[in-house]
Amino acid sequence: MELREEAWSPGPLDSEDQQMASHENPVDILIMDDDDVPSWPPTKLSPPQSAPPAGPPPRPRPPAPYICNECGKSFSHWSKLTRHQRTHTGERPNACADCGKTFSQSSHLVQHRRIHTGEKPYACLECGKRFSWSSNLMQHQRIHTGEKPYTCPDCGRSFTQSKSLAKHRRSHSGLKPFVCPRCGRGFSQPKSLARHLRLHPELSGPGVAAKVLAASVRRAKGPEEAVAADGEIAIPVGDGEGIIVVGAPGEGAAAAAAMAGAGAKAAGPRSRRAPAPKPYVCLECGKGFGHGAGLLAHQRAQHGDGLGAAGGEEPAHICVECGEGFVQGAALRRHKKIHAVGAPSVCSSCGQSYYRAGGEEEDDDDEAAGGRCPECRGGEGR
């Protein structure tokens, strides 16, 4: 038998040999017996550790060293305390350059200025309609979503706005807070009182009607607000016959009647001098304006697209005298008679009020007709 010497070469390694060869130090290999092999699935599991909170920890509230002496409320900055104290002092240092209205905060002035500039930065994503205030946009979006968060507790009917619910609830209670100071008749809506005031010539003037409406709206909100707003307002009636006191503290609006024999001098100490006349009054909220354009801008911003707009239509016919808008031209022509002739006339036959079709040149014809309305005069020729 012949023996040969051959060079040894490593053969193919199995999986275990490859694992051992991969370690430089054989000591790193852990060899366990069958008894030491852990069972699967494990019998005991430790609870998972809670993940650390995402983001930075909440910042601590800053100290509030500035305290209001009136109510004890504290603030972190002196400027915030100064702004808060204006609610107690009534200071309004921010004035509008266009209408003179004052505000306690500059941000409120910025919002008010949008009435004059026409700026509408808030747009509806559904229809593209724009608004001057975010609150108006929120109310408008309920038209698309169908949301009606204000529900009547009496009948269950829902509304999109709180003021609509307040108007509706008067139908259940029968409350008529808007009272005519001349005859004591009550109305549930301020616009109904405005139409009724045309029957009283001494109350149909723009300036007088504005005071009556504003005082009636304030009195409907509460006696405290009525007294704090303007107190007593004395309105002359006729030529020295007497006055009507509107907004007298401690009295109901129905008790504010004509004071015969008081004279024109009695109106002096009772009247409170206003900074500027505001003959144009919003029939929805009672707010007064010095110009018709301001009233129209207010109504479009706060109460919709203007007076006379039915079903969301844009009023295309605007009165140049007061800024009131109408959808139809015929309604505008009827409205212009108020500015052309002033107070309405009362028919001597039927007692109904009516407006003459022309100005002073038709007074002779009206007197010749005996002060009768066109319906009564027209019936004579039939």
From Swiss-Prot:
Post-translational modification Phosphotyrosine, affected residues: Y122
Span of zinc fingers (C2H2-type): 66-88, 94-116, 122-144, 150-172, 178-200, 280-303, 317-339
Any one of the GO BP annotations: regulation of transcription by RNA polymerase II
Cross-link Glycyl lysine isopeptide (Lys-Gly) (interchain with G-Cter in SUMO2), sequence positions: K191, K211
Region of interest (Disordered), residue spans: 1-65, 357-382
Compositional bias ranges of the Pro residues kind: 39-65
Residues the record lists as Phosphothreonine modifications: T117
GO CC terms in record: nucleus
Phosphoserine PTM sites in chain numbering: S132
GO molecular function: DNA-binding transcription factor activity, RNA polymerase II-specific; sequence-specific DNA binding; sequence-specific double-stranded DNA binding; zinc ion binding
Localization annotation: Nucleus
Domain of life of the organism encoding this protein: Eukaryota
Keyword annotations from UniProtKB, A to Z: DNA-binding, Isopeptide bond, Metal-binding, Nucleus, Phosphoprotein, Repeat, Transcription, Transcription regulation, Ubl conjugation, Zinc, Zinc-finger
Record-linked InterPro entries: Snail/Krueppel_Znf (IPR050527), Znf_C2H2_sf (IPR036236), Znf_C2H2_type (IPR013087)
Function: May be involved in transcriptional regulation.
Family: Belongs to the krueppel C2H2-type zinc-finger protein family.
Name assigned to this protein: Zinc finger protein 787
Species per Swiss-Prot/TrEMBL record: Homo sapiens (Human)
Gene name linked to the record: ZNF787
